[in-house]
Structure formats: structure tokens, C-alpha cells
């Protein structure tokens, strides 16, 4: 910059710049974290080499902690992680960005629907029935998150937040960092800070990106006609009927060719054989040949001493793998910060979003295009000879399934979400060190769902058409009054304290209407149907109020102390138990601040810290919901008991312990963080079933009866390995976490059996409880199970085998690593994620790989071919197929339980920045082109599992829409 003129330029990545100057003018060179240098222009100056020196008073890295307060990382006593560059991937929502990138954070995708939610767990599972997802806070206020839709799959409130508008994400993991938020933070807190304007001239930024979408994992392939028939031949010959009638496959084929089989199950095989020349590829019909993703964002920001502003407008659309499946979004973020007087600052932040989701059914539904790929016969024609869809008879095809290609055109499943989040803030400097802050943040969400089922074919045929309309309206607000005091005593003593009052209220209304019998095939509104089927609505109103006090003290940043206490009152409980008290204490000492270590210069941090506290957890509990009045008895209002009053019902509480070590070398060019954590949950809420004599078959009593523990280690290393004057930079980082989860107390210590799993004292919350598969009898091809559920003696009789604990869906070791290499104008970023020690159960395999039980009806997986027992293949993975099944071989067991160990290349980005000198005269400050890929490569260590190891939330996969792989091309422009 030319001193005294305000005229200046930014250097390119090589340090080159071009600026017209006059003799005698002074050039000023500056950069954040470096000492400013001044050079006088002289007539003989031809070349200027500048090397800025690090500023010993470099601005410290800060993170946002409780209620918008910023704190230097080196002064923390708690477990906090920070993510920058959130937009360096193709994830639509910020919850998916967290997966694999933060120590102690694990989870999975719930659906391959674009814009769907992710399951996020911080340091294990907080509760059996309560909240296991973290609280999300945007710019200091808690917000709604998750899927609030009533019917359609894939709704995600957080998908309404544009990642390009996010400055950073901070993850709070222990008591000292979360207790100030109080009653519902046992599962952690995710703090999202959005971008703000900075002092300077208006800065315009435009980014555009277009990409190709494909499957992240190929998954199981469907059978071809030839493959299906080969299995059916063997299954029929292995049956009593087939083995008695035909001595060989050649004899069977001879009769099939002349159409001689007309009785028994052989007639079914004959009818299928007669259609052997039809080869319908259902996957090809229902999936996109070329799915696309596209987005464009435009922002303007700037400011001066009085006013700063940031405004953005963004558009995004992403197709799913299957047809008629997409997510489309428009977002806008508008932030203004105005210094009204020397003491008064006013801020507004308004975020708007509109999202339109076109969903497809998931799970074991005939209308699910993924389910149909395996269940529909390849011998069934999708189209008639005239080009119209084949609708079969009575609304279904020959095996009772639906033409999924037709349903994608006939039916629709739409979801429209409007979200408004406003944040109005006032800061007033009461005295020199005393600041008052007032925050009012309302949030409004409107979700409209429109489900239409055609009367022509499929699940709307029997009802002559169906229309389901749902509406969800959520209005909430957050009110805060905060008084903060900061004081420095004799330079080395620093004290800060905050007194906080917070109120939060959420009002949610759900309304739905179902009508049947369409008046016309072309009219799809409710008023176009003849028969009203049902109308219902609910309202949930929850409020809470809390008071908190926080205190931070440090002596020369050497000794650190954090204290907090909070009182919360929640409407979920009776008055006697509505009040909860939460606290935390954190201690730390940074030995690198001692004179002895300062002299070495190599050690920049050596901090030991520990924290402990008591935090709460939210449960959808209602101790006073005794009756449900939603039943008709002889045209009179009727109610049934659904619960029993329990005035003793109270908070679930957690007691997190954290012990940490943070080390930095060479001005933090190398950093290492180690932490041990232990999180105990007490007074877990369970719903105990009551006998029918006490109410109804569904009546329960909610009680506090359980305890649980999570513990583990976290290790994170980051290093700036190379940084030289030639423009070569190399950064390398990684993190690894361990987790041990155990239930330590239950009601009467009695195990509770769930679907495929069990809750049992001394075991993990996520353990599978199954019979153990022992393989195939090499002599007979019969299925085998271990009698005791573990090892030793085997049996081919399913009922003789016992169930036993067979592993957990929670990974015991997980993490990620990344590297970034840049040379002059070129940069390469790679991010990996991994997980080990967990199990995945394929619930769909019992239908799609069931050894002839229903194979003649529903073909299933192509992996059946060549993998089952024959006299020539005795050491096989699967039993011999028998028409109508082989000794219950497809019943639940560890046969369909896989190791979830995986390694994935999550993100790969290659970018090129045009040199600044090339942009002279173009009004451009920056021009960058890049290639960005997400989920480009995945390695499953268990070769039997063909699916996506992250496409699960609770260890089960079941015909969900495929997870997405994207490869995008984009550009960034600043002017």
C-alpha cells in the first residue's frame, strides 16, 4: 500500500504485485501475524525483495464458545475443536461436514436423499431414549435441526443453511464448554458462526459449480434373467418335487423347452422360463444416466468504522441417483453491524431459505425404486408393445410388486420447507469493563408435504387414488440478557465473568389430511378426491428459562481457571422437578509460558487441562400425558390410557470428565492434542410397559432407572511441514478416537430385547443379539449355527441355536486424516475418514439372499450366483438353494452381520489461482478454478459387504437410497 493514499494491491501467491508509484513515496507491506515493513521508493529502485517477520504479538487463534463469546484457543480448559473452510466439500448441510473431520465425532448418513440429515454423535451415546444429537447454535442462539417432516423422507432443517455463508464451526465436547447451555447439552454443542462484513471497500464474490453425481458405492447388483434362472434351476432340483422328477439339470431343461411342466411348483418355473427372452434392467430404468449438481453463490461485504455488512444469495440443486429425486434450495444471509455511538452497537442477522425436495420411498416398500431393483423380475416387461407402461393386473405385476419405473412418473412425494431465522442484538458498554448484550432471535419453519398415489397402478390402486397433505409449523424464539465483565489486574491477571439470562420457547403444530378416490387421474389436490379418510393434528409447546454465571481467570496465560453454574426450568416435568442445576469447573496450566521454556523457542505450548461437571439431557417425556382422546366409540368421543402419572420423573443428567494435553512446537507449526474422556449418564428415562389391566396394550410409565458410561481417548496431530519462500507449502493432519460404551445400571438388571439388539447391563447400548452363523455343511449344503451362540458345537436346526451378543454398531476406533499441498498457484487438498470395530446388519438380505425361500417370487442380489453350495462347490459362502427355503437359513443371524471397517476418501480438491498480475485491468481481485470430488473412493475391509459403510445411523441398512459421489468443476471470482 502507498502510505497516506489508501491505494494498494494484494500480492499473488508468489508475492508478486504491480503498483504505479512516484519517487519518494513510501510502500507499506503488511500481513496478519507479521510485522509491518516500510520502504521508500527511490529512482534507482528496480527490484524489491521483502521477507516479513513473524510478529511476536501475533493475533491468537480464537474460537466461539458459550453465547457468542470468543476465547483464545490457548486459554481453553475444555475440549473444543474448530473447523474452518466448511465449504471445501460438496455436502449440502453442515451436519454432514462434521463426519470424519473432528476428533470424537462419529455418525453416519441416514439416507441417500439429497439434503437429508446425518446422524452426529459426540463422544459416544448420551442416552437410550433421550437426545443423542448435539445442540446446534448459530451466531449465539440455539436453532432447530433434524428431520421435522411427518411423512416424506430426507427433510433436514440444517440443509437450509448455505455452507458458503459459514465462517467456522466449533464443537464443544466436555462439561466446561457445554454446561453454560444447560439442560439439553449432554450430547454436545455445535456452534456455527456465519460470515460477517469486514472493514474495507465493498468486496464482491461470485462462485459457480456444476458436477456429476453417481453412487458412492456400487452396492449389490440385481440379477439378470439368465442368472435368475440358473438359481431357480438348482433350487427346483434341490426340492423334493424337483429331485424326484428329474435326475439332472439337462432333463429339467429338456422338459422346460417343450413346455411339459404344468403341475406343482414346477409350473411356476415353467412360466418364468417361458419369459426367458425378456431382459429388463430395472436399475437402469429407475436410475439417472447422468445426475447433476449445480450451485451458484453471490456475496457482497464490506464496511467502515461505523458500519459493516454482509449479504449473500445462493442457489443449489442436486439430483439423486434415482429419477424424480432431487433437492433444490435458495438461500439468503443478510448481516448488518452498526456502531451507533461509542457505547452502543446494533446488529441484525436475517437468514432466509426455501427448499424443495422431490423424494422417493425407502425401506421395504414395493414403491421404493431401490427395493424394486431386486424384487422385480427381470422377465417382467416395463413397457407394453405400444410404448405404454405395463401396469399388470389389479394394480400390480405378476409377483405382486409394482412397476417402479411407472410409479416414478405416476406418483409424487414433494416437500417444501421455508425457514426464517432472525437475530437482533444490542451491545451497550455500561462502563469501561462492563458490557450488556440483549439478543432476540425468532425462528419460523413451515414444512408442507404433498404425497400423491395414482389410482392407475401401485399402492393407490386399491383405494382408487390417495392424496396425503401434511403441514408442520414451528415457531420458536430465544431471548438472552447477558452482562459481561472483563478486567486486567497488573497486566498478568485477567478476569472475565458473565451473568446470563436465557429463555427459549418452541411451538410446533402438525396437521395432516388423507383423502381417497380420485375424481380425475389428472387432478391431485385434496378437493379433487371424493372420500375423506382422516384428518388429525397435534401441538407441542415447550418452554424453558435459565440463569447462568461463568467465570474465567488466567494468570499470565500460565494458570487457567473456568467455572460455570446454571439453573434451568423446563415445562416437561411437574413443578417439583422442573428445576435443574448444572455446573462445571476447568483447570489448566501452560508450562510453555514459564521463562525456562520461553528461552528454548522451540516449544510454543505445553498445556495440561482437566474439566468436570454436570449437564442435562433432553428427553421427549411427558409425566402428565395420561389419556389420548383420538378414538370413536359409537360416535362418541373416547379416550384410552397411554401413560401413568409420575410426579417423580426428572432430568437425565450427565457427568463428563476430560483430561487433556496440548503441545505446540515452532510457533505452533506442529501441534498435538491428547484427551481422555469419561461421560457418565444417570437417571436415564425408560418407558416401562404396563399390563392391559392397568390401561391398554400400549400404556407405559416413564421412570428414571438407568445409567450408562462412555469413555475413550482422542489424539489429534497437525503439522505445517514445509513453508518456504519458493511458494511450496505442505500441511498434514490427522485424528484418531477410541470409544467404549457400557450400560452400568438397568431396571432390575433385566435385559430388554429390541429388534435384533438387546439392552443389557455391562454391554454397549448398540450390541446385536443374534444367533451366530457357522457357515455351510460341506457335505449337505445345509445351514449351520452355533448352538451356544458363540462357538463350538453346531446345528442345522435354527431353533436349537441360542442368541448371543455379537458386537456393536458403535465403532471402537475412528477418525480421519488430511493433507494439503500447494505450490505457487496450485493447491491440492485430500481428506480421508475411517472407522473400525463396529458391525453393520443388512436387513434387506433376508429378502434378497434367502436361498430359494422366495427367490422364485423376488429374485434378489446378483451375488447369489456362484456363491452357494453345489456338489462341485462345497466350501461355499451360502447354503444350497431349495425351492421354498433351506431350513430357515434366511432368518435373522450373523450371516447378514458384517464388519463395518472402512477407509474413505471423503474430499479431494485441486485448485488453480490466476496470478494477480494477469488480472490487471480486468477489475478482478481473484480468479480461481477448481475440481472437487466427494466420496470418490471407499474401501470396505469386509468384502462380503457391498454397500456404503456410512449409510446407517444405528447399524442397519435396509433398501435406502444410494449415498452420493460427486465430481464438480467450479470457479471463484472476487472483484
Label the model's feature ranges.
Residues 133, 329, 335-344, 349-354, ...:
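Extracellular/periplasmic, surface-exposed regions of secreted and cell-surface proteins
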Residues 1-333, 338, 345-347, 421, ...:
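Short, small/polar-rich motifs associated with maturation and membrane association
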Residues 271, 570, 835-928, 933:
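Extracytoplasmic gating/loop element in the C-terminal half of outer-membrane beta-barrel translocons
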Residues 205-274, 722-809, 840, 849, ...:
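Conserved small-residue
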Residues 277, 353, 358-421, 474, ...:
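Acidic/polar loop-and-plug regions of large Gram-negative outer-membrane beta-barrel proteins
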Residues 808-843:
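Glycine-rich, aromatic-lined ligand/substrate-binding cores of catalytic
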Residues 2, 29, 136, 383, ...:
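Short aromatic-centered micro-motifs
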